[in-house]
Swiss-Prot record:
Cofactors (names): Zn(2+)
Name recorded for this polypeptide: Probable zinc-binding alcohol dehydrogenase Rv1895
Entry-linked SUPFAM superfamilies: GroES-like, NAD(P)-binding Rossmann-fold domains
GO molecular function, one term: zinc ion binding
Listed InterPro entries: ADH-like_C, ADH-like_N, ADH_Zn_CS, GroES-like_sf, NAD(P)-bd_dom_sf, PKS_ER
Binding site for Zn(2+) 1: 38, 59
PANTHER family in the cross-refs: DEHYDROGENASE, ZINC-CONTAINING, PUTATIVE (AFU_ORTHOLOGUE AFUA_2G02810)-RELATED, ZINC-TYPE ALCOHOL DEHYDROGENASE-LIKE
Length: 384
C-alpha cells in the first residue's frame, strides 16, 4: 500500500510499504477513501515535533472496512465508517465515558508514530467498536472527516468555555478548529463572537458566518468593543505563546479561557498571579471525539450546525507533498485539504471488497502454513 510519511521538517513523500495486518480480534482494517491534512500534521511538517525515523502521517480517516476481527460487533466488512483520531483501549473505566482522552492506558493518536497513519491506502484500527462508527444517513464525507477531529475539538472547546446565553465569546485562530468552535459558540448561546486571525481571507470567511472579525492581536480591540469588560469566554485555537497571552488579556475577570490549540514542546509561563487575582478559569483539552458524536450528528443532519466549506481543496494521495506545502502557507482561500486515495489502488486487481477480503484471508492461511511447516504444525488448524 501507499502511505504519506515524513522524513524531516518540510519533507513528506508517498511511500510504498506492506499492507497492515488485522490488529487483533477486536480490530478492523479500513480502506481509506478520504483523509484530512490537519493543523496538527503541520506541526510535524514544520519540525516542532521531530521524529528519529520516517513516520506515517494523518489521523482523520473515512473509509470502507475490508477486514474485521471476530470480536467486532458494531461494524462489519463493507461498512463505510469514520475513525476517531484519538484511540483508547475501549474497555477501561476511562473509555466507558466515551472519551478516549480518559483512557487509563493513555490515549494514542493515529499518525503520531505508534499507530498507523490515516493518509494511506489502508489503516489498521484496534478496538474498533470504540474507535469506529458507521457513517449515519445524511452525513457527507467532509462532515464525517470533521467529526473525526476538528468539529469534535471545536465543539469541546465551546463546551468547556462556560458559554452562557447572550454572552460575548472570542475565538482566536480561524483554521478548521477555530471555525468549528465559532459555529459551536453560537449554538451554545453566544450573542457575539469575535473572530480573531492574522489572515484577511479567514476573517472575511468568519464574517460571512455572523462573527465580528478582528485582526490579531485582539485584546485591546475586544476590550474597547465590550467597554473595558472583556469577553466572557475566549477559545484559543492556535496554540502559541502569543495567542495564549492574547486570550488571557482579552477575557473578563471571572471569565474562562478554553485552549485547544496545540502548543510546541516549550513551556509557557502562565501568569498565575494575574489569573488568581482576576479569577480566570483556564481549561485545556484534547478532543473527546467519540463522546461528541451523539451530540453533533443530529445537529448536522438537521442542518442546525453548518460546517460546509471548511474543506476547500481535494487532492489525490500521490500529491500529498503539494497539499502540505500549500497548507503551510495558511492562506485565506485554501483552508483544509482532503487527500483521496483511489480505492482501485487499494483493491489492486480485485474488483470488490469481498474478493479483496478473501484474498487477504488466503494470504493469512498461506503465511500460517509456512510458519506451521517450520514448527511441524498444520497451518489451517491454527486458525480454529
Amino acid at each position: 500500500m501507499r502511505a504519506v510519511v515524513i522524513d524531516g521538517a518540510g519533507s513528506v513523500r508517498v511511500n510504498t510499504q506492506p499492507d497492515p495486518a488485522l490488529p487483533g480480534p477486536d480490530g478492523v482494517v479500513v480502506a481509506v477513501t478520504a483523509a484530512g491534512i490537519c493543523g496538527s500534521d503541520l506541526h510535524f511538517y514544520e519540525g516542532e515535533y521531530p521524529f528519529t525515523e520516517p513516520v506515517a502521517l494523518g489521523h482523520e480517516a473515512v473509509g470502507t472496512i475490508v477486514e474485521a476481527g471476530p470480536q467486532v460487533r458494531t461494524v462489519g466488512v463493507g461498512d463505510l465508517v469514520m475513525v476517531s483520531s484519538v484511540a483508547g483501549c475501549g474497555v477501561c473505566p476511562g473509555c466507558e465515558t466515551h472519551d478516549p482522552v480518559m483512557c487509563f492506558s493513555g490515549p494514542m493518536i493515529f499518525g503520531a508514530g505508534v499507530l498507523g497513519g490515516a493518509q494511506a491506502d489502508l489503516l489498521a484500527v484496534p478496538a474498533a467498536d470504540f474507535q469506529v462508527l458507521k457513517i449515519p444517513e445524511g452525513i457527507t464525507t467532509e462532515q464525517a472527516l470533521l467529526l473525526t477531529d476538528n468539529l469534535a475539538t471545536g465543539w469541546a472547546a465551546a463546551q468547556r468555555a462556560d458559554i452562557s446565553f447572550g454572552s460575548a465569546v472570542a475565538v482566536i485562530g480561524l483554521g478548521a478548529v477555530g471555525l468549528c468552535a465559532l459555529r459551536s459558540a453560537f449554538i451554545h448561546g453566544a450573542a457575539t463572537v469575535f473572530a480573531v486571525d492574522r489572515v484577511k481571507g479567514r476573517l472575511q470567511r468568519a464574517a460571512t458566518w455572523g462573527a465580528t472579525p478582528i485582526p490579531s492581536p485582539a485584546a485591546e480591540t475586544i476590550l474597547a468593543a465590550t467597554r473595558g469588560r472583556g469577553a466572557d469566554s475566549v477559545i484559543d485555537a492556535v496554540g502559541t505563546d502569543a495567542s495564549m497571552s492574547d486570550a488571557l488579556n482579552a477575557v473578563r475577570p471571572g471569565g474562562t479561557v478554553s485552549v485547544v490549540g496545540v502548543h510546541d514542546l516549550q513551556p509557557f509561563p502562565v501568569p498565575a498571579l494575574t489569573c488568581l487575582l482576576r479569577s480566570i478559569t483556564l481549561r485545556m483539552t484534547m478532543a473527546p471525539v467519540q463522546r461528541t458524536w451523539p451530540e453533533l450528528i443530529p445537529l448536522l443532519q438537521s442542518g442546525r450546525l453548518d460546517v460546509d466549506g471548511i474543506f476547500t481543496t481535494t487532492l489525490p494521495l500521490d500529491e500529498a507533498a503539494k497539499g502540505y506545502a500549500t497548507a503551510r502557507a495558511r492562506s485565506g482561500e485554501e483552508l483544509r485539504f482532503c487527500l483521496r486515495p483511489d480505492s482501485r489502488d487499494v483493491l489492486g486487481a480485485h474488483e470488490t471488497v469481498d474478493l479483496y477480503v478473501h484474498v487477504r484471508r488466503c494470504q493469512s492461511v498461506a503465511d500460517l502454513q509456512l510458519e506451521g511447516a517450520a514448527d511441524g504444525v498444520d497451518g489451517p488448524s491454527m486458525l480454529n
